[in-house]
A protein has these predicted regions:
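Membrane-embedded helix-loop-helix hairpins and adjacent transmembrane boundary segments
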Residues: 352-836
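Basic side chains
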Residues: 2-3, 34, 70, 117, ...
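Short secondary-structure capping/junction motifs at helix and strand boundaries
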Residues: 2, 104-109, 154-155, 430-433, ...
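Alpha-helix capping and helix-coil boundary motifs
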Residues: 10, 73, 151-152, 217, ...
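Kelch-like beta-propeller repeat domains
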Residues: 11, 19-358
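Bacterial Sec-dependent N-terminal signal peptides
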Residues: 1-19
Length: 836
């Protein structure tokens, strides 16, 4: 028994624990006790307006409620200040609204609501204010109103109609879902009427923001959340706890996909009260009897699951205001009721955080991996004999190693994290794209590979000069080098961002570690070090993914069977979207985009083509291409299974999620750090480093090859082999350092707008290069001027598509390539006619 206890303690000590924590601390109290008030963050501090109380005679003794001068409206923090909306006074509901300047506290009238409302909820998102629920002098309001902000001149409009007859005192928030942002209306209640019983809503309804933007959404367009059945912190227990009411509560979106709820009434006690079943002493019990919620209720939009986080008695209030502290962390939670009729002056500072620590054992594993990669660079540097070894590995790379290298190169850390994140948030609809890699392998082997091998080139862009002219070669090589350096920065930055979020490792340290180690080992050892490094890193990736799949399956309640059942019940294994839309990832968009984009990558990307030239012969290169295709189809299944496993695990363990997580792409690294033993987590984090470094090393070596061969050697034809190697090494260092520095700068930028630009530029560039190589291989009569004109035409059409249509970005490659080919052919018709 003692031995088992010791073993359990030892194993627990090795776990990487990441735990959500709710921190509360008292702040300066209000001047008077109020509930149903308005609050905003004005000039660096909390500002209170309105509210109500029983200042003279207690409510239990028949006291009169006093309004100051109104209450039960909504206050919403907006850019530049706060808006106070509607409410009621002692006689009627109100429609008047105020805007309070966040700097000087001055107030100005704001556009009045379309009708007087009280006991509703409101929120702000992306330039729009939304109002939902409530009532007008006792008549329920089913409409959802919206108004642009700050351009409020358009006035309020009806954005949607709620599917429920009455939701008084609901909570409203906008948060991410698998399909984009959605407006959620949670909880609320309906009082007893002549035709219906009283009801406390224990679910929420939601609708995409994109639908609301169009206006006039009907009740059938809303979807429902699961009921607020909270399992609390004992996530392994299936014992059902009471339903949680969301009445008298406040809420806020947190992180990428959570909503947190503070305070509120007890479901059963409140339902009895509004149904008229309360006892005669209802207003005279001690505050603890009413069971106002002190714990923090959480809702996760991706898994549609609820949880409870341990809170504090300071949060056990109803009708309080939750105000985001602008420029700081957390919220101010002010006023409210301690029990029916008894108001509070309390103000509480609330923060929700997640403790993170990487741990010494994980650091040890990661350090050993990095040292091993440096040792590999030193080993291959000693074996190197001239330029052919540096650029082509002496033609002695085995076919299977070349295939694994291609696979590891194309599978960056972004892919390693985003594929699980994609199947976690949605389904498997992107998986058929990987089938296209294997399908494309056959024409690449039959037509392109012999062409590349026959010309015996070192840089892929030498082909374009031999086939067209030197300008085409220089243009393509320049664009490739620019694209690769920017890609290095992106591939360094994004995984570092996610790793920082879940491990606590400084983002700059992440970038520098991965960047410097990669630059050193690939500069020392040339392409041979890169390829064998890819093999090691590829195996780490594959075995790490397989281990994660098994670990997730056995960790889900019900094991593998439970995992499959949950996935099927929630449609997480869907492979095809059979609709005909060209703006979504429908079946034909996936197939067409997958074919074109993979054909472009495997026929015009120097990082891939260089692998074709490192094997002893053409047959070996073909086998390597097939190895990559087979791995892409079958091994990559593991990454989709990981995403599905993450969904099923967190569906059954909702409180284990980091509610502060800022992006869904961090979900897999977060699982590693929070659920796996130390050391194992370090090995899997090393796998993310490996995915990053395999891509970066290939990019660095390819840029060095392109610069040295297409520019230096092209214009310095008498350069010796030893000089070429020196130039290539310096090109590796310079290009790698530029990429590293750019990644460090990205850590200080607003990266989202840059990523949008980068994705657009990626579609523009790759489609044009793919078209050039297709023309070079298959269209012998097309001249250089026609090929360049086709390139420009393809780029122009793709740019037009991206700016003026809603076409899915997966179609850019196919469209640009097709336009390039057709334009070049049309401009070369005279050559075909002369031949005829």
């Amino acid at each position: 028994m003692k031995k088992n206890l010791f073993l359990s303690f030892f194993l627990c000590s090795l776990l990487c624990v990441a735990q959500n924590r709710v921190s509360v601390s008292p702040a300066a109290p209000l001047d008077r006790a109020v509930s149903g008030h308005y609050a905003g963050w004005i000039n660096g501090g909390l500002s209170i307006y309105g509210g109500c109380n029983f200042p003279d005679v207690p409510c239990a003794d028949g006291g009169q409620k006093v309004y100051y001068p109104r209450a039960y409206g909504a206050s919403v923090q907006v850019p530049g200040g706060v808006v106070y909306l509607g409410g009621m006074d002692s006689t009627a509901s109100l429609s008047e609204c105020l805007f309070i300047n966040g700097t000087d506290g001055t107030s100005t009238p704001f556009a009045s609501l379309p009708k007087a409302l009280d006991n509703f909820a409101a929120t702000y998102h992306d330039g729009t204010l939304y109002v939902a629920g409530g009532q007008t002098d006792g008549t329920p309001n089913k409409d959802v109103y919206s108004i642009p902000f700050p351009n409020k001149e358009e006035g309020w409009s009806i954005a949607a109609t709620l599917p429920d007859e009455c939701r008084l005192q609901p909570c409203v928030a906008v948060q991410n879902t698998a399909a984009g942002h959605a407006l959620f209306v949670f909880g609320g209640y309906a009082p007893k009427t002549e035709g219906s019983e009283a009801k406390v809503h224990t679910d929420g309804v939601y609708i995409p923001v994109a639908v609301l933007k169009k206006g006039g959404a009907i009740p059938t367009q809303w979807k429902r959340t699961s009921p607020t059945l909270a399992l609390g912190n004992n996530t392994d227990s299936k014992q059902e706890k009471p339903l949680q009411a969301i009445v008298g509560s406040t809420c806020s979106p947190v992180g990428y996909s959570h909503v947190v709820f503070f305070g509120g009434v007890d479901h059963d006690i409140f339902l009895n009260a509004i149904a008229g079943r309360q006892d005669s002493q209802y207003l005279r019990h001690a505050p603890e009897w009413y069971k106002f919620r002190k714990d923090v209720l959480t809702y996760h939009t991706i898994t549609d699951s609820w949880g409870l986080l341990p809170g504090d008695s300071l949060l056990a209030r109803a009708g309080a205001c939750l105000t985001p502290e602008v420029g700081g962390k957390g919220w101010s939670y002010s006023g409210g009721e301690l029990m029916p009729g008894v108001r509070s002056t309390d103000v509480t500072h609330v923060e929700v955080s997640n403790d993170k620590s990487f741990g010494w054992l994980n650091w040890t594993v990661l350090t050993l991996y990095l040292i091993g990669m440096l040792g590999m660079g030193i080993y291959f540097m000693r074996k190197e004999n001239g330029a052919d070894d540096f650029f082509k590995g002496g033609g002695r790379i085995p076919w299977w190693a070349a295939g694994i290298s291609i696979y590891a190169t194309m599978l960056s850390a972004i892919t390693y994290m985003t594929i699980p994140a994609k199947s976690y948030t949605t389904d498997w609809t992107y998986y058929p794209m990987l089938w296209m890699i294997l399908l494309v392998s056959f024409p690449v082997i039959k037509y392109y590979l012999p062409y590349f091998r026959k010309l015996n080139v070192t840089s892929a862009y030498e082909i374009l000069e031999q086939r067209f002219n030197v300008f085409t070669r220089m243009l393509a090589s320049t664009l490739f080098c620019i694209f690769m350096i920017v890609r290095m920065a992106i591939v360094l930055y994004l995984p570092s961002l996610a790793l920082t979020a879940v491990t606590g490792i400084d983002i700059y340290l992440c970038i520098i570690l991965m960047g410097l180690v990669t630059i050193i080992y690939c500069t020392m050892g040339g392409v041979e070090a890169v390829i064998w490094g890819d093999v090691v890193q590829g195996l780490i990736l594959v075995f790490g993914a397989i281990f994660a799949v098994i670990y997730l399956a056995v960790s889900t309640e019900g094991g593998i069977g439970g995992c499959i059942d949950i996935a099927l019940d929630n449609d997480k294994l869907r492979l095809f979207d059979w609709s005909n839309s060209w703006s979504q990832a429908t079946w034909w968009v996936i197939i067409l985009g997958g074919l074109a984009n993979n054909l472009i990558s495997y026929t015009s990307d120097q990082t891939v083509i260089q692998r074709y030239l490192t094997t002893p012969d053409e047959k070996s290169a073909g086998r390597g291409i097939l190895v990559n295709g087979v791995m892409s189809v079958f091994v990559s299944v593991a990454f989709y299974m990981i995403g599905t496993g993450l969904y099923t695990f967190y569906k059954t363990h909702p409180v284990e999620l980091d509610i502060t997580m800022g992006q869904s792409d961090a979900i897999f690294p977060f699982f590693m750090m929070s659920q796996m033993p130390a050391g194992v987590a370090g090995a899997l984090i090393a796998a993310i480093f490996a995915a990053t470094m395999s891509t970066i090393s290939s990019n660095i070596n390819s840029v060095a090859t392109a610069f040295t061969i297409d520019f230096w050697k092209r214009f310095r034809t008498s350069t010796t082999d030893s000089t070429l190697v020196v130039v290539a090494r310096w090109a590796s260092v310079v290009s790698g350092m530029i990429g590293l520095l750019l990644a460090l700068f990205m850590a200080t930028w607003d990266i989202q707008s840059f990523l949008d630009f980068f994705n657009e530029a990626l579609g523009l560039l790759t489609s044009g290069l793919g078209g050039l190589f297709f023309i070079a291989v298959f269209m012998k009569r097309v001249k250089g001027y026609a090929a360049l004109a086709g390139f420009v035409a393809g780029e122009a059409v793709v740019f037009w598509m991206s700016e003026y249509t809603d076409a899915n970005f997966l179609l850019f490659g196919a469209t640009g390539m097709a336009v390039s080919i057709v334009t070049a052919w049309l401009l070369s018709l005279d050559s075909y006619f002369r031949k005829s």
